[in-house]
């Protein structure tokens, strides 16, 4: 196999679908509106609507991906679950419901990313780093969220493992999702990171966009 063919195996390419970039302009606009207009003094339903619009747009945008199939449907389901989680997190008392919704979203992403290639060597380092971070946060957590957050963390790490193994934009989307959740957990359970909300939301929206874009990439060729 020559180097050019080998490169095709390693590097997923975006399908030749027109105006994918232009199709994301409403998403970027919705993100900007939320970040600029969001205000704690507004009625909660206004902030909920502004917050979930970018993610709902991505779910609709996935309808333009060809071919469609199960991968696209799983991503759309994950985005809809994420929108429910986003809405729940507007109210601090609904944190556990938000974790449940996002946990389901990650299970759908996990199913979409699949188990091929397996790359088991990635899993242990990810589990170790996650366990260390959880141990740092643990003394600051209310007792009622310890077990739900532990379960959520395991699902999140599994999603990251499969996203990294899949490669392409899903790789970077999974990484940014974990970064966003890590900063959010620090903000909630320890102390506020400077500009923490901006960091959480920009990494979160970027993560969802990159995972969405993985549906527009050509399937990777496999060698036998």
Curated annotation (Swiss-Prot):
Cellular component annotations (GO), alphabetically ordered: cytoplasm; endoplasmic reticulum membrane; membrane
Top EC category: hydrolase
Key words of the record: Cytoplasm, Endoplasmic reticulum, Hydrolase, Lipid metabolism, Membrane, Transmembrane, Transmembrane helix
Subcellular location field: Endoplasmic reticulum membrane; Cytoplasm
Activation and inhibition: Competitively inhibited by lysophosphatidic acid.
Membrane-spanning intervals of the chain: 20-37, 45-65, 73-91, 98-114, 121-137, 145-161, 172-189, 198-216
Homology family: Belongs to the TMEM86 family.
Function: Catalyzes the hydrolysis of the vinyl ether bond of choline or ethanolamine lysoplasmalogens, forming fatty aldehyde and glycerophosphocholine or glycerophosphoethanolamine, respectively and is specific for the sn-2-deacylated (lyso) form of plasmalogen.
UniProt-recorded name of the protein: Lysoplasmalogenase TMEM86B
Organism annotation: Bos taurus
Gene from which the chain derives: TMEM86B
